[in-house]
Amino acid sequence: MKKIMIPIFSLLIFSCSKDSTNDSNDLDNNNPEFTANQSFSIEEHSAFESSIGIIKATDKDNDALTYTIQSEADLIINENTGEITIGENTILDFETTPSISATISVFDGTTIVDEDIIITLENIEEYAILTAEQKELVDYFRYLTLWEDSNALSSIQKWGAPMKIFLDGAISTDYKATVQSVLDQYNALFNLGTFSITIVETKTESNVHLYYGNAEEIETLWPDMHEIIEGKTYDGYAISSGTGLALNNSRIWISSPIESLLKHELGHSLGLGHSNKCDEEKSFLCSTISPNNDFLDVEKEIIRFLYHKDMVPGTTAEELNNAVGNLILLN
């Protein structure tokens, strides 16, 4: 779902150059002139056909004036009135494009005069203009990525580099196929960025070590994890770590072949906490799961946005509402 959004323009017009072209021999013709110090504004994420403002020019001969515009952005100008509006293919976002250049041309029937302008974009609070449903998505994004079910984090955690998983323990052909199926489902959700998860053949080339076996086997392999799971009823566990703001290493223990358990522990490794959508909706991130637990549609969107190329590792709780809101509006 792609929404066309338009940022607030403070259309600040600076005369970088002013050229005239006269193809006739009418030396008595007066060139048209742009009105000085014009400025315009429009809200970020405004709708298609929203008006930025009207470029004004005058002609001492009272000739009829015709306007045209050239810009890398999809901007439209009314040739008779000079009103600039947003084109259908315009996606204007303050966070990625704080200003836009354009050239306005005015023609009086004899002479063309050009004016280079800079359109500056003003930021808005994206969360404030979301629908109620969109705000619910943001709130649930916060719940999962800030681990609000337990000790809430102050910023999100996510992987910077692709995951490379080494499979260890009692890995049967059938279970390896299950792992690949789960990875395929996850990878389909990373379509807004460059992140991916793959299986590798050696531990040396991996950054994720997945072990399939019983809890007792973890005591020798990962003593620190065994201290956590000993005496508990856990069927799996994941511990991730990183450098700076990005995750880059994970250890995952799995004791059951059900697909939902692997999805669950991989979700934790990717930076997601437990869900509160468990009584009826059966999220794959519920603390207690069965084969019936799976990705909810809203969770698929959350994974897409978490691993969007513009979602920065370490985005703080204070920044999160507008960061996610911006991605919702742009996608």
Residue ranges of model-derived segments:
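Envelope-exposed proteins and targeting segments
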Residues: 53, 159-163, 206-208, 248-250, ...
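Disordered inhibitory propeptide/activation segment of secreted metzincin zinc metalloprotease zymogens
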Residues: 125-173, 181, 187-188, 237-244, ...
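Short, charged/polar, Gly/Pro-enriched secondary-structure boundary elements
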Residues: 91-93, 127-128, 215-220, 291-292
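Metalloprotease/metallohydrolase-associated module, dominated by Zn2+-dependent proteases
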Residues: 129-131, 232-257, 273-331
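Positively charged n-region of N-terminal signal peptides that target proteins for export
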Residues: 1-4
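Acidic, turn/loop-rich segments in luminal/extracellular domains of secretory-pathway
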Residues: 17-23, 28, 32-33, 39-50, ...
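Bacterial Sec-dependent N-terminal signal peptides
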Residues: 10-35, 111, 124-138, 320-331
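Metzincin-family zinc-dependent endopeptidase catalytic domain
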Residues: 173-278
